[in-house]
Amino acid sequence: MTSMSHHRSLQAELETLTTEAFRPELAEIDQLPTLEIARLMNGEDATVPAAVAARLPQIAAAIDAVADRMARGGRLVYAGAGTAGRLGVLDASECPPTFNTDPSEVVGLIAGGPSAMVTSIEGAEDSKELAAGDLAGLGLTADDTVVGVSASGRTPYAIGAVEYARARGALTVGLSCNADSALAAAADHGIEIVAGPELLTGSTRLKAGTAQKLVLNMLSTITMIRLGKTYGNLMVDVRASNEKLRARSRRIVALATGAADEEVERALAATDGEVKNAILTILGGVDGPTAARLLEESDGHLRAALAAAPR
């Protein structure tokens, strides 16, 4: 195939994608007052949650499968290029401080490596082999999950990641913003959030990016809920790595137990600042070492540990 014919083929393919569609009614948007453009953009953004809601059954099924793998010691790996890759890295980076996960448990891979977070790496997204190499470096196992993220659903890096992972028995999820995408078809679980054409033609950092962020929020957050990383809606596995989080830790213990400040401080001191353990010492009436043992025996699930505490 000649270079010119390849470009024509690619152009024809892109023209079929909802995320690339041109909207003639917005052709003079640059002539509008700033407030009117803001209203238009806000209205566009408001349609995204409904598009996500239409795929909640598929999202929930993927989450249950991910949680099952992670409960066996597996990892959650996001793989994408450009905005999609950055969103995966962002979600992965928030898990250690929020849920006290090891940085190796939830991983974000972006085509072109860490420098691609701030600089476009030419050609990186076009390589399936690059994705395979990145995943090979992680020593992928059958207990792991790989989530390929691509607004178009055709990005070779994301598809290559899913294909490589699936061939090795890992669970695969394909998150796209176009219907009938190659990415969703390549994965065990396809999630296609069709939010419609963008305000700026083809700028998928807008509605598509918002949709992807909402889904990734669900994937990581609900998986962690299933793994016992929360107690109700409290982040009991939060890592108190700064003063704000230390204050939050004290508040979480107080909210979960109703204990006074002095008792909260004693409980945290007796458990080396571990929120979940501190709650267990107060509600379960056990000492720090016993709390640690009960939580270990309950795979970190606080409710199960409380049920097992001697009364």
UniProtKB/Swiss-Prot annotation:
Organism: Streptomyces avermitilis (strain ATCC 31267 / DSM 46492 / JCM 5070 / NBRC 14893 / NCIMB 12804 / NRRL 8165 / MA-4680)
Gene3D superfamilies: 1.10.8.1080, Glucose-6-phosphate isomerase like protein, domain 1
Classification via PANTHER family: GLUCOKINASE REGULATORY PROTEIN
EC number(s) recorded for this UniProt protein: 4.2.1.126
Other remarks in the entry: A lyase-type mechanism (elimination/hydration) is suggested for the cleavage of the lactyl ether bond of MurNAc 6-phosphate, with the formation of an alpha,beta-unsaturated aldehyde intermediate with (E)-stereochemistry, followed by the syn addition of water to give product.
SIS domain segment(s): 66-229
Top EC category: lyase
Pfam families linked to this entry: GKRP_SIS_N
Signal peptide bounds: none
Protein name per Swiss-Prot or TrEMBL: N-acetylmuramic acid 6-phosphate etherase
Annotated function: Specifically catalyzes the cleavage of the D-lactyl ether substituent of MurNAc 6-phosphate, producing GlcNAc 6-phosphate and D-lactate.
Pathway assigned to this chain's UniProt record: Amino-sugar metabolism; N-acetylmuramate degradation
InterPro entries listed in its UniProt record: Etherase_MurQ (IPR005488), Glucokinase_regulatory_CS (IPR005486), MURQ/GCKR (IPR040190), SIS_dom (IPR001347), SIS_dom_sf (IPR046348)
Active site per the UniProt annotation: 94, 125
SUBUNIT field: Homodimer.
Record GO biological process: amino sugar catabolic process; N-acetylmuramic acid catabolic process; peptidoglycan turnover
Top-level lineage group: Bacteria
Alphabetical UniProt keywords: Carbohydrate metabolism, Lyase
Family affiliation: Belongs to the GCKR-like family. MurNAc-6-P etherase subfamily.
Reactions listed under catalytic activity: N-acetyl-D-muramate 6-phosphate + H2O = N-acetyl-D-glucosamine 6-phosphate + (R)-lactate
Example GO molecular function: carbon-oxygen lyase activity
